[in-house]
Amino acid sequence: MTEHDLSLWLEQWVSAVTGEAEIDPSKPLEAYGLSSRDAVILSGELENLLGVKLDPTIAYQYPTIEALAHALTASQEDKQGVRGARAGRMQTVSASPAQRDIAIVGRAGRFPGAANADELWALLLDGAVTTGPLPAGRWSEYAGDPYLRTKMKEEATDGGYLDDIASFDNEFFGLSPLEAQNMDPQQRIMLEVAWEALEDAHIPADRLRGTPVGVFVGSSGNDYGMLIGADPAQAHPYALTGASSAIIPNRISYAFDFRGPSMNVDTACSSSLVSVHHAVRALRDGECDVALAGGVNILANPFASLMFSELGVISPTGGIRAFSDDADGIVRSEAAGFIVLKRVADAVANEDEILAVIKGSATNSDGHSNGLTAPNPDAQVDVLERAYADAGIDPATVDLVEAHGTGTILGDPIEATALGAVLGRD
C-alpha cells in the first residue's frame, strides 16, 4: 500500500469513527476527539490491513495521519536513518567522576504505612499494599456541599494516605500557633523531613547556617490553597505565604538560614525527579555545596481526585497493576521525602556514608504530542538516551529500571516501548 492510499484509508477511518466530514491529514488525531481506546483499536485495524505487528501506541508515536501514513510505508533505509540519528545522541561525556557524580548521603520521608525510609523498605520487601479507603474526617470541610458529598460517594477515592498530616511542633521551628495553623501541611511536613534527612546524613542543620545549601522541592498542585480559597472568611493573612507552593522550599531555607538556590518544581508526575535533576546541576555548577532534593504530595481536598476518577484515570478497583493486562488506572497517594546530596569528592573528603551515587540525569518535554497530557514515545526515548549519555553509561549494561508505571492502557505500553528502544537496542 502506498503512502497516499494509506493516508486516504486513515482519513476515512477517522471520519467514520468521529463523524467528521472534513479530515485534515496534518492535524493531530487528538483534535478530532479520538480517545486512547480508539487509538488502540486503530492500531489493531492497521495490523489487519497491513499484515504487520504494530505497537498499540503507534498513533501516539505519529500523531497525525500524515506522519502515521509516512511511518508505516517508509523504506527500511529511512528507518535505519532514524536509528542512526538516535545513536548519535548516545555519545557519552568524559569528566572527573568525583566532580560530576553526586553522592546521596542522607534520606528521610513519610509514606502510607511507613513513618520513615527504613519502614518503606520493609514494606517493599514484604510486598505489602498500604493503599486503602479515604481516612475518616478527610475532606470533611466539603461534607455540607450536597454535590460534592454525592460525588465523594460515587467516585473512586481509595488511595495511599498518611496517618497524620496535622501534628506539628511549631515551637521547634520558631513558629507561632497562628502561623502554623495557616500553613499548608506540605510546608509543615517538609520542614520536619528536611531536619530528619540532615540528621540521617549526620550533618547538624546549625552547622550549615549561612552556607550555600540548596533546597529543591517537587510539588504539583495546591490543594491547601484551594481549601483556603473555598472559605476566605476563615483565612488569616498568614495564609498568603502558608498556601504558596513556592514557600515550601523557601520556608526551609528561611528556617535554617540556607543561602543556596531554593525552588519549587512543578512538572506534574515528574516533579520530584526533576527537583533532583536541578539539585544535581546546581551541585555540579558550584551553586551549592549541599542540597536537599525531594518532593511532597498531600491530598487536602477532593477536586483533583474526583476529576481524575470521572475521567476514568483512577483505578475503580483501587489496585496498582502497572504493566499488567489487568491494569485499570492509577491510584493517587500522599508522601513526602528528601535526599541529601553532595559532590562525591566532598562526601569522600568528609568521610560521609555514601548510600548511592547519581551519575547522570536529563529532562525534556514531550513537545507537541497527540494531546496535551498524552506521552510522546520519541521524547521518552530521547530523555533516556540523554540521561545515560550524561552518566557515561552504556544502556546495554543496565540491569534494573524503576518505571513510572501508570497502569493505564496507553501509558504502560509507551513507557515499555521507550525502555525497550534504549535498553534493548542490541
Name each region found by the language model.
Residues 96-426:
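Condensing-enzyme catalytic core of the thiolase-fold
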